[in-house]
């Protein structure tokens, strides 16, 4: 069956139901839950505090029950221990807002297409490849933020008004079956949600597609985070190579979809950091920050100082980048750095101390002006074979060698518009592969970053890194310190600078020499190909979503950083990737874990050989013939008996 939300059957009490008993909740929610759980005495509510949380895991689904492999499956639970010594078990479940392609309320009495695509003039982009035209919609929802505003004005909300910002990375195929990857401008939507004041249940009231035309549209929006100042920080990964744009058919297709002209889009307008501001009426606005480096932006994590941003770079021969804004809560100007990996271990995912190279200081406005006017040939000369000219420098770039030479006076343009190449030239360690999500454990001053796959660039030394794997990736911990200097000896104006990097032992994948009985090529009881990661301060839990080419089903995990226990919480449909992860400790007294998936049934001929025949018809029935995907969240159901 499909995962359409059914409000009439919804009996959610809340996600992680113990959390409203925290002092942050108070009020009717805490009282109602104490009564429901047998407490009975409302006056006792403020004295009862959540002390600890542990999760109970679920087994990975198998072909013994194919239906569970073909949908989002949750068989996990939570035990909450309170200050009165009592422990309460809760089961977890998954609830959707919609399956993309559904008509959803537009807030004006009508409906609109969820996940729908629009051109630069906000006209629907139509798929004319099938027997009848239809508007394109995405099967790849990704980064999600949950937030609230002080004075919302959306009509029709009976409880608390909560907003979610959801971005859609790409669409896999048109009706004919041809790949559409990267050939459509990524949409972003603001969802207005009605939060039940007693149970915390969320109901979709309004869907609004954000106008991104002022930012020249968006390119392959992947992970996202919520800023400390309550905005949605988006992403644009796999920036188009401006030096080879004339032969880039993907970018030409993108330009044609966006502008109706295959040559109009400017590659230097993409690969930046978009920021979405939500308005009280449930609409939103978009601007791009051009001063944070033009890289394969997967996700940025802003530190508690509200100035320092650590950035995931989902690339081959990518780097670890840090941006320090000139002003708090303002990413429109600042200083860009790249890390140098000083290796201390090759085993178990490797380890290193980190040095920081300053690439430059700039404002978004000045780099935008350069992007508007410059071509690649104005900034640098690039060769893909050795020119036998000493004025060129060999660097690693996207899995191969480039020989580059910066044009006189173009260092700043190169630093912010050709960031990968310039960072390599400056001595940055450009050997990372598939650096994905980034998050922060504020109490311990530890950042975490996910390396989804340890590829050849991390093992062959081409980018200054030479470790032994495992190929299915790992989550790394980075200690954050004050008082650091860059490689030029200048003080770095931040107390949140990563000084070292090492894989977390419990979050190191395990490659299998021989596939298991289901076809997994990495141990299914360990994290493999980690992608989305988010840390919950109150739960002391690092949530990890997989983008795995080694697990038949991808999983969402919870890792307690104090007890070092890893627990499987959720399984996505086979062939799908776990996306949209966002852990929210307190939204009007309730906690939530947002979770989407994308491209269900994206079959690999080898990985899914044993399951495809059985699961493909089930997934097609569940998810609009594989054109749809779920946007939703993990919920908690109290066990009252």
Language-model region placement:
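N-terminal secretory signal peptides
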Residues: 1-35
């Amino acid at each position: 069956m499909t995962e359409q939300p059914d409000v009439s059957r919804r009996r959610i009490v809340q996600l992680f139901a113990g959390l409203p008993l925290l002092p942050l909740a108070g009020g009717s929610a805490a009282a109602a839950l104490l009564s429901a759980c047998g407490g009975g005495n409302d006056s006792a509510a403020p004295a009862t505090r959540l002390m600890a949380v542990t999760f109970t895991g679920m087994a990975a689904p198998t072909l013994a029950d194919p239906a569970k492999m073909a949908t989002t499956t949750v068989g996990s639970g939570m035990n909450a221990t309170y200050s009165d010594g009592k422990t309460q078990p809760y089961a977890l479940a998954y609830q959707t807002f919609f399956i993309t392609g559904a008509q959803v309320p537009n807030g004006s009495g009508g409906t609109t297409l969820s996940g729908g695509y629009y051109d630069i003039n906000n006209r629907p982009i139509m798929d004319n490849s099938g027997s009848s035209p239809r508007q394109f919609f995405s099967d790849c929802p990704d980064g999600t933020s949950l937030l609230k505003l002080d004075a919302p004005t959306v009509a029709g909300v009976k409880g608390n008004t909560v907003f979610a910002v959801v971005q859609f990375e790409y669409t896999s195929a048109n009706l004919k079956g041809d790949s559409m990857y990267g050939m459509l401008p990524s949409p972003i939507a603001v969802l207005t949600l009605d939060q039940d004041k007693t149970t915390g249940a969320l109901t979709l009231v309004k869907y609004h597609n954000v106008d991104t035309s002022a930012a020249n549209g968006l390119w392959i929006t992947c992970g996202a985070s919520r800023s400390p100042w309550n905005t949605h920080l988006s992403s644009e990964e796999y920036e188009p190579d401006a030096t080879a744009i004339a032969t880039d058919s993907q970018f030409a297709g993108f330009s044609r979809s966006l502008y109706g002209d295959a040559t109009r889009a400017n590659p230097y307008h993409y690969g930046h950091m978009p920021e979405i501001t939500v308005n009280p009426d449930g609409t939103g606005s978009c601007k791009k920050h051009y001063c944070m480096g033009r890289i394969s932006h997967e996700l940025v994590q802003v530190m508690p100082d509200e100035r320092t941003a650590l950035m995931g770079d989902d690339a081959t021969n990518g780097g670890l980048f840090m941006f320090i804004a000139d002003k708090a809560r303002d990413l429109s100007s600042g200083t860009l750095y790249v890390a140098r990996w000083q290796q201390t271990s090759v085993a178990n995912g490797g380890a290193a101390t980190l040095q920081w190279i300053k690439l430059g200081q700039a404002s978004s406005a000045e780099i935008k002006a350069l992007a508007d006017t410059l071509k690649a040939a104005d900034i640098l000369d690039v060769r893909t074979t050795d020119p036998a000219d000493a004025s060129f420098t060999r660097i690693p770039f996207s899995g191969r060698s480039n020989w580059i030479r910066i044009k006189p006076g173009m260092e700043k343009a190169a630093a912010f518009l050709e960031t990968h190449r310039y960072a390599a030239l400056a001595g940055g360690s450009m050997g990372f592969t598939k650096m994905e999500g980034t998050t922060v454990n504020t109490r311990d001053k530890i950042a975490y970053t996910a390396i989804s796959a340890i590829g050849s660039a991390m093992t062959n030394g081409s980018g200054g890194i030479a470790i032994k794997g495992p190929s299915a990736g790992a989550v790394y911990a980075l200690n954050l310190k004050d008082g650091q200097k860059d490689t030029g000896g200048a003080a770095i104006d931040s107390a949140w600078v990563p000084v070292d990097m090492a894989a977390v032992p419990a979050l190191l994948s395990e490659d299998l020499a021989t596939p298991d009985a289901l076809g997994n090529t990495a141990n299914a009881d360990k994290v493999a190909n980690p992608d989305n990661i988010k840390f919950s301060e109150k739960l002391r839990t690092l949530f990890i979503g997989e983008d795995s080419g080694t697990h038949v089903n991808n999983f969402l995990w919870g890792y307690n950083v104090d007890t070092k226990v890893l627990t499987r919480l959720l399984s996505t449909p086979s062939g799908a990737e776990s996306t949209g992860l966002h852990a929210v400790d307190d939204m009007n007294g309730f906690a939530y874990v947002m979770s989407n998936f994308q491209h269900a049934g994206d079959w690999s001929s080898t990985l899914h050989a044993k399951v495809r025949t059985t699961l493909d018809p089930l997934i097609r029935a569940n998810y609009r013939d594989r054109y749809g995907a779920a946007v939703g969240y993990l919920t908690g159901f109290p066990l009252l008996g």
